[in-house]
């Protein structure tokens, strides 16, 4: 029978001490976790010490602060008293949700309550977790300072002496980064298996390569493409960089479930789909629930939903980011705090889409800083459809345009923000036919005048501005005939402004190419050259390479236009799905991805003029991505000087190209010469040895007679030397006989 406390002897006590067992590992393993309900509690320290009769007054005063970050009440604030009926200087507060408790810690910790008291706010669970005995060392131990390690140069590829460009290639389960070597095979930089699970994506300036995994996103960079940052977003599916690479947006269809012990994600991210990250710190700025878009106008049937992506759109200078709640509002947030501009969203009834200007524009007569945002709303009741331009941060509408009989609208900004083209698809009054007209806003001109291009008779299916230019290309198509097996033909139209002294004239049609199958437009990033192609087609795969500033003779009918159009070459790439220009505008890659079809996957390299340099069939080819370059550091004057001396530079480049070819040819010739010289030297050496042997045996120089050789062999045997005979067997004829 086990002894009771009353009957416990001294011997029993000593035995207990001797047999004491260390249960620390089991305690750690089976430690009872705190109730989930405690994650709504916070502890507020730094409060004034007041008597019991003043406690309620202090609680009411404290609630003014607390209700700015969440919802709580007097009953949810517990302020304990000591034996002298005085408060202890702290209080326990319960919020409605864990997110509100987290917000209280983030926003109220360290803020002043009055001139003499500063609030110290902590989660109750954190105090319980870190305040237990043994969790924190009593003695201060200085942190170990790791030795300095020089970081890799994240833009080292720009220092390539031959000014080559890099590209990423995703095929099978391998991702590689290569140098482009023109006519020669690409030079491998790095090639890794299972580098990504979904896809890879370059950041806008080429600093980082992003890989996407079920655990989140990782950024790679430097000469060896080492890991730079990671962003834990479980089951992430889509990512988007800000224009200056300062921020990253990630999205997953699955709401986030924060696991206990997760170091970066907090309860504030619980249940959200979108996270906006700060790339420099690797920490989330804010998280959101995603909004779906309706796939079409609401009718009797429930409209289909589609993912709104990009969910957030960035201003050119990254000072603002905005998202749209379709049909209701646009919310504009200020960076880096991610607080709502003016603390309210911009209410816009029926809003369908919006786009920021891709560059900071200075309008005539406007001196203050602004970013421009363009949006459109459909016809609602008797109200017409509307396109409007808003100035941020003032939220002032600076230009509006009413539209009628509108089916759809697309907004196309020119890369410098000089124009925004509003592509308006209109239906006839009977709603049986469709046509498109263009409303072009001239942003920098006084009052933002609008030019209308209404000469188009068909529906525009694609539109693209020339980068850093004022010309555009569009593709139109007629209405599909019901039951027809073949899609209607398309027409490609080229537009340019009229010459008007120093000003930019009205936009006019240069030329229309009829009876095409083209459906895609790809401008060179430097302008001037454009590829008009047919992609994602099962029957047509043509690519037309056009020059908008051809240096040859200009047709008489086009002399008033700021362009000289010339088709340089037409080529085909079977099954082509994607076309990508390199960032310098020198090369074009056409590719056929296994993500679209599994027929003759691979990629082809072309010059800007359409000459095919190489064809690269690649099994299980998925992605080809040129590495972007950051904007040039040269001033406009320096760039102008470079263009002025381009012919002189071209001579140097041509000489370098010839030298490189000569070096390659010289290397081949030198190798052949070396092998020939080695052979000649060997022959000379063998002849010298043979002459010495003949001299030793007393044979004449021309003694090659077999009889003399036989006598020489006998002589060598007499002299006691060893003779090695080599027997060579040769099969003259071989037959097989079967004996029955």
Curated annotation (Swiss-Prot):
Swiss-Prot/TrEMBL WD repeat ranges: 193-230, 232-289, 302-343, 455-496, 513-556, 571-609
UniProt keyword terms in alphabetical order: Cytoplasm, Initiation factor, Protein biosynthesis, Repeat, RNA-binding, WD repeat
A GO biological process held by the record: formation of cytoplasmic translation initiation complex
Disordered, as annotated region: 1-20, 696-721
Biased composition range(s): Polar residues: 1-10
GO MF: identical protein binding; RNA binding; translation initiation factor activity; translation initiation factor binding
Main location: cytoplasm
Any Pfam family the entry gives: eIF2A
Matches recorded under CDD domains: RRM_eIF3B (cd12278)
Entry-linked SMART domains: RRM
Keyword Protein biosynthesis carried by entry: yes
GO annotation, cellular component aspect: cytoplasmic stress granule; eukaryotic 43S preinitiation complex; eukaryotic 48S preinitiation complex; eukaryotic translation initiation factor 3 complex; eukaryotic translation initiation factor 3 complex, eIF3e; eukaryotic translation initiation factor 3 complex, eIF3m; multi-eIF complex
InterPro entries: EIF3B (IPR011400), eIF3B_RRM (IPR034363), Nucleotide-bd_a/b_plait_sf (IPR012677), RBD_domain_sf (IPR035979), RRM_dom (IPR000504), TIF_beta_prop-like (IPR013979), WD40/YVTN_repeat-like_dom_sf (IPR015943)
Function: RNA-binding component of the eukaryotic translation initiation factor 3 (eIF-3) complex, which is involved in protein synthesis of a specialized repertoire of mRNAs and, together with other initiation factors, stimulates binding of mRNA and methionyl-tRNAi to the 40S ribosome. The eIF-3 complex specifically targets and initiates translation of a subset of mRNAs involved in cell proliferation.
Subunit structure: Component of the eukaryotic translation initiation factor 3 (eIF-3) complex.
Family of this protein: Belongs to the eIF-3 subunit B family.
PANTHER family xrefs: EUKARYOTIC TRANSLATION INITIATION FACTOR 3 EIF3 -RELATED (PTHR14068), EUKARYOTIC TRANSLATION INITIATION FACTOR 3 SUBUNIT B (PTHR14068:SF0)
HAMAP family: eIF3b (MF_03001)
Protein name in the entry: Eukaryotic translation initiation factor 3 subunit B
Annotated organism of origin: Aspergillus fumigatus (strain ATCC MYA-4609 / CBS 101355 / FGSC A1100 / Af293)
């Amino acid at each position: 029978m086990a002894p009771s406390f009353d009957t416990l002897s001294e011997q029993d006590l000593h035995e207990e001490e001797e047999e004491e067992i260390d249960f620390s590992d089991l305690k750690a393993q089976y430690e009872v976790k705190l109730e989930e309900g405690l994650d709504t509690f916070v502890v507020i320290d730094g409060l004034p010490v007041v008597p019991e009769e003043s406690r309620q007054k202090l609680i009411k005063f404290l609630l003014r602060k607390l209700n700015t970050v969440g919802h709580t009440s007097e009953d949810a604030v517990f302020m304990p008293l000591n034996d002298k009926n005085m408060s202890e200087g702290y209080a326990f507060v319960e919020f409605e949700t864990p997110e509100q408790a987290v917000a209280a810690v983030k926003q109220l910790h360290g803020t002043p309550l009055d001139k003499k008291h500063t609030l110290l706010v902590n989660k109750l669970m954190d105090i319980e977790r870190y305040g237990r005995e043994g969790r924190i060392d009593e003695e201060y131990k200085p942190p170990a300072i790791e030795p300095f390690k020089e970081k890799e140069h994240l833009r080292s590829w720009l220092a390539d002496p031959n000014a080559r460009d890099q590209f990423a290639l995703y095929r099978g389960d391998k991702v590689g980064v290569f140098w482009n070597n023109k006519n020669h095979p690409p030079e491998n930089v790095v090639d890794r298996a299972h580098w990504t699970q979904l896809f890879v994506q370059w950041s806008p300036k080429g600093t980082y390569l992003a890989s996407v995994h079920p655990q989140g996103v990782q950024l790679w960079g430097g000469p060896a493409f080492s890991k730079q940052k990671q962003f834990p977003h479980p089951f992430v599916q889509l990512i988007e960089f800000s224009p200056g690479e300062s921020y990253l947006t990630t999205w997953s269809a699955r709401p986030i479930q924060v696991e206990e012990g997760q170091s970066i994600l907090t309860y504030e991210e619980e249940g959200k789909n979108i996270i906006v990250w700060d790339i420099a710190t690797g920490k989330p700025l804010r998280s959101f629930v995603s909004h779906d878009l309706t796939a079409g106008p609401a009718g009797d049937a429930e409209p289909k939903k589609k993912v709104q992506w990009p969910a957030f759109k960035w201003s050119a200078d990254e000072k603002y980011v905005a998202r749209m709640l379709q049909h209701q509002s646009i919310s504009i947030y200020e960076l880096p705090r991610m607080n709502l501009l003016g603390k309210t969203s911009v209410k816009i009834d029926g809003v369908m889409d919006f786009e920021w200007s891709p560059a900071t524009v200075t309008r005539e007569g406007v001196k203050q800083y602004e970013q421009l945002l363009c949006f459109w709303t459909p016809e609602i009741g008797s109200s017409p459809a509307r396109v409007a331009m808003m100035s941020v941060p003032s939220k002032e509408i600076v230009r509006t345009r009413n539209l009628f009989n509108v089916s759809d609208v697309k907004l196309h900004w020119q890369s410098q923000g000089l124009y925004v083209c509003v592509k308006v698809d209109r239906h006839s009054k009977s709603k049986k036919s469709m046509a498109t007209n263009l409303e072009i806003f001239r942003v920098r001109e006084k009052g933002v005048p609008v030019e209308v291009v209404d000469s188009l008779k068909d529906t525009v299916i694609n539109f693209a501005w020339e980068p850093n230019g004022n010309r555009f290309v569009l593709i139109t198509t007629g209405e599909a005939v019901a039951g027809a097996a073949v899609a209607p033909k398309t027409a490609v139209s080229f537009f340019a402004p009229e010459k008007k002294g120093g000003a930019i004239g009205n936009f006019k049609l240069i030329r229309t190419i009829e009876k095409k199958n083209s459906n895609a437009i790809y401008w060179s990033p430097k302008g001037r050259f454009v590829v008009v192609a047919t992609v994602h087609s099962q029957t047509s795969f043509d690519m037309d390479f056009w020059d908008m500033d051809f240096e040859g003779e200009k047709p008489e009918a086009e002399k008033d236009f700021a362009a000289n159009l010339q088709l340089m070459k037409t080529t085909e790439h079977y099954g082509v799905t994607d076309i990508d220009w390199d960032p310098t505008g020198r090369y074009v890659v056409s590719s056929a991805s296994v993500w679209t079809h599994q027929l003759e996957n691979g990629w082809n390299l072309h010059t800007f003029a359409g000459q095919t340099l190489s064809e690269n069939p690649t099994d299980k080819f998925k992605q080809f991505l040129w590495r972007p370059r950051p904007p040039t550091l040269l001033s406009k004057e320096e760039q102008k000087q470079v263009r002025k001396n381009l012919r002189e530079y071209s001579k140097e480049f041509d000489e370098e190209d010839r030298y490189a070819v000569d070096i390659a040819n010289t290397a081949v010739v030198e190798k052949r010469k070396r092998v020939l010289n080695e052979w000649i030297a060997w022959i000379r050496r063998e002849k010298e040895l043979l002459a010495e042997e003949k001299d030793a045996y007393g044979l004449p120089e021309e003694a090659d007679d077999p009889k003399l050789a036989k006598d020489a062999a006998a002589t060598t045997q007499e002299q006691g030397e060893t003779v090695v005979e080599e027997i060579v067997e040769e099969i003259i004829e071989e037959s097989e006989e079967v004996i029955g």
